From Swiss-Prot:
<keyword id="KW-0648">Protein biosynthesis</keyword>
<dbReference type="GO" id="GO:0050566">
    <property type="term" value="F:asparaginyl-tRNA synthase (glutamine-hydrolyzing) activity"/>
</dbReference>
<dbReference type="Pfam" id="PF02934">
    <property type="entry name" value="GatB_N"/>
</dbReference>
<dbReference type="InterPro" id="IPR042114">
    <property type="entry name" value="GatB_C_1"/>
</dbReference>
<keyword id="KW-0436">Ligase</keyword>
<keyword id="KW-0067">ATP-binding</keyword>
<dbReference type="GO" id="GO:0070681">
    <property type="term" value="P:glutaminyl-tRNAGln biosynthesis via transamidation"/>
</dbReference>
<comment type="function">
    <text>Allows the formation of correctly charged Asn-tRNA(Asn) or Gln-tRNA(Gln) through the transamidation of misacylated Asp-tRNA(Asn) or Glu-tRNA(Gln) in organisms which lack either or both of asparaginyl-tRNA or glutaminyl-tRNA synthetases. The reaction takes place in the presence of glutamine and ATP through an activated phospho-Asp-tRNA(Asn) or phospho-Glu-tRNA(Gln).</text>
</comment>
<protein>
    <recommendedName>
        <fullName>Aspartyl/glutamyl-tRNA(Asn/Gln) amidotransferase subunit B</fullName>
        <ecNumber>6.3.5.-</ecNumber>
    </recommendedName>
</protein>
<dbReference type="Pfam" id="PF02637">
    <property type="entry name" value="GatB_Yqey"/>
</dbReference>
<dbReference type="InterPro" id="IPR004413">
    <property type="entry name" value="GatB"/>
</dbReference>
<dbReference type="InterPro" id="IPR014746">
    <property type="entry name" value="Gln_synth/guanido_kin_cat_dom"/>
</dbReference>
<dbReference type="InterPro" id="IPR003789">
    <property type="entry name" value="Asn/Gln_tRNA_amidoTrase-B-like"/>
</dbReference>
<dbReference type="GO" id="GO:0050567">
    <property type="term" value="F:glutaminyl-tRNA synthase (glutamine-hydrolyzing) activity"/>
</dbReference>
<dbReference type="InterPro" id="IPR006075">
    <property type="entry name" value="Asn/Gln-tRNA_Trfase_suB/E_cat"/>
</dbReference>
<dbReference type="InterPro" id="IPR017959">
    <property type="entry name" value="Asn/Gln-tRNA_amidoTrfase_suB/E"/>
</dbReference>
<dbReference type="InterPro" id="IPR017958">
    <property type="entry name" value="Gln-tRNA_amidoTrfase_suB_CS"/>
</dbReference>
Amino acid sequence: MNFVTTIGLEVHVELKTNSKIFSPSPVQFGSEPNANTNVIDWGYPGVLPTPNKGVVEAGIKAATALHAEIEHHTYFDRKNYFYPDNPKAYQITQHEKPIAHDGWIEIEVDGKKKKIGIEEMHIEEDAGKNTHENDYSYVDLNRQGTPLIEIVSKPDIASPEEAYAYCEALRQRIQFTGVSDVKMEEGSMRVDVNISIRPAGSDKYGVKTEMKNLNSFNYVRKSLEYEEQRQQQVLMAGGKIQQETRRFDETTGQTILMRVKEGSDDYRYFPEPDIPAVDIDDDWIASVKKTIPEMPGSRRERYINEFGLTAYDAGVLTQTKEMSDFFDATVAEGADPKLASNYLQGDVNAYLNEHKVDLLATDLTPTNLAGMIKMISDETISSKIAKKVFKAIMAGSEPVQWVNDKGLVQLSDPAKLQPIVDDVLDNNQQSIDDFKNGKDRAVGFLVGQIMKKTRGQANPKVVNQLLMTSLKAR
């Protein structure tokens, strides 16, 4: 029996602002518990929220990146529920008039492109954090009031692989706008998943199950793979799917029942009386749009068409805005695009992974990387010497000056190399005889001897040309 899978995702993205959405408390990850709070965050009676204009502008940016329609007249609502990490007993969110709706992003799976619709995007405040330890429960309200956007997809996702691709495409586009760092390890991006299956040919959606607060795209994919299989087995055995909230166990790779939902939650939404509606006119939207940088898809096309990079290389370079900007700046400094791409993906990426640092936290700059690459292109240095130059750059040296100070300029002058070639040949008659007898490896040995005498500074291309001419003349 064949089944059709339907998946919807709700992605919560923490916005990168200096202060919270309705209070002046700072937004800082890793602070001492309850250090970044005030009376508004604590929900004291009589205190009033003040909307953060920067949050609305971040919402406009994100909506634009998601090709969404921006609501010109939007307002906030109260979502009523009680929990210790929510001291007001309600959350300020958007329900009736979210800031944006009807957007889309494009994904690619197995070489096939597909548009995934976005139902809506709304702004809301985050809740605090509960920690349970021994016989005590602790409440940390540092996160309370942190601005979020929640992006709700349409039920257009048809497989766990598509869900993974959607999350990755969404992460890239949001990160490129600069409204969030989307660091999942710090909770800046969390995903709620909904999945249902139905027999092929049926138009009626199946009963969905949900899993909340997944903080890894791999967990999103693995939880959906397991749940897809589980639901198929239940239906094929003649059972029925219940509407459930389940938890994904990272250790076992299984989903575990948390609770059965007999109906939809009633949060008794009503308009937030303490915050006026927000009117967003076309001029405001236009001014915000001007600050949005080139998106990853456009950059990938430019890298392929303008620089001749492969689709794979263009994809790697646009994984983050940081790397993409660095590449563009390096090429603007005169570096060969393909060499710049190779170094960023190779030596640079290996260094970042080994030392566990961000690119912008190193001594590498587009100027000094381009300086090294230009010396490779004009054969001032060899690729072998470039390895040493790269290490020197990462230790804080300027590449051109360092190469000159160390006397590592590549020797390319035939007039200076010919005597060295002759000397090596004079002392290696056996290798000359081997070459004349068709043993090509003799050439490699002779090149190695020449490179040894020049301490690796001889231009290999020139050496090979001189050597072959000299061998044939003997």
